[in-house]
């Protein structure tokens, strides 16, 4: 029976996921298939390359670096997180990514993305990070603060828009047992997002994005109900923070990140 790994997003809250995956590396825990959403896809890279501590360093080493993120990058490039630094300078030079180990890992990794034209989630293979880095970037491209990413003629944004917790996909993909890592605390339920009119205006050419945002809270909470049922059935094991934390999606406080 195949066991899958499902990683929720959460932007800088993903530092929690990085810590969980470091524990898995220490314990020698592997999974047949792994599904990463947004920051979860980023964390999945360092897990599959078996580089303990690397993703935590990526989250925390560049907090004061204006080349890493910020309004200047957003205004200059359309991306709050600087694409050149995040997806090229860091893995290729500043904090080298082990491409060879990643490529040899028998586990299959998938970056969850949202097709902004169809409004559907897609699960892009992460087979080779030299070729598939844009799949990870697309998965982590948050609305309003990121440009859509074009891959093979299709435009994508953050996978969390269409499938925040892809447990059902993991099950239908053959993983009857799954470990789910969430960045939201026990008891969390999503509420209707703010800035819906801004979303509607920004993505006027892609109305599916607005539809997804309008329905996101209800869809997310339905996924939580399904997850809870799978946990009760013994077919899913859930790891998440036990209590609320002060870490924001764009968090620059190193102490808060370390505490999480």
Feature locations, PLM:
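Patatin-like phospholipase
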Residues: 1-37, 45-260
């Amino acid at each position: 029976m195949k066991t899958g790994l499902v990683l929720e997003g959460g932007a800088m809250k993903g530092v929690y996921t990085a810590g969980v995956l470091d524990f898995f590396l220490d314990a020698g825990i592997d999974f047949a298939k792994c599904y990463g959403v947004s920051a979860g896809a980023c964390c999945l890279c360092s897990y599959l390359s078996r580089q303990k501590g690397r993703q935590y360093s990526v989250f925390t080493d560049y907090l004061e670096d204006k080349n890493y993120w910020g309004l200047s990058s957003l205004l200059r490039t359309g991306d709050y997180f600087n694409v050149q630094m995040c997806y090229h300078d860091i893995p290729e030079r500043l904090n080298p990514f082990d491409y060879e180990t990643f490529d040899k890992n028998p586990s299959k990794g998938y970056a969850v993305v949202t097709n902004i034209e169809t409004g559907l989630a897609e699960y892009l293979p992460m087979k080779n990070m030299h070729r598939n880095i844009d799949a990870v970037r697309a998965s982590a491209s948050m609305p309003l603060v990121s440009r859509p990413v074009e891959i093979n003629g299709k435009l994508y944004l953050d996978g969390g828009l269409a499938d925040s917790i892809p447990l059902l996909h993991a099950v239908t993909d053959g993983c009857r047992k799954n470990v789910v890592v969430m960045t939201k605390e026990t008891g969390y339920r999503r509420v209707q997002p703010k800035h819906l009119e801004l979303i509607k205006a920004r993505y006027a050419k892609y109305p599916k994005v607005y539809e997804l945002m309008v329905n996101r809270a209800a869809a997310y909470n339905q996924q939580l109900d399904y997850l809870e049922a799978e946990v009760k059935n013994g077919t899913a094991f859930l790891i998440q923070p036990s209590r609320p934390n002060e870490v924001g999606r764009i968090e620059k406080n190193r102490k808060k990140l370390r505490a999480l």
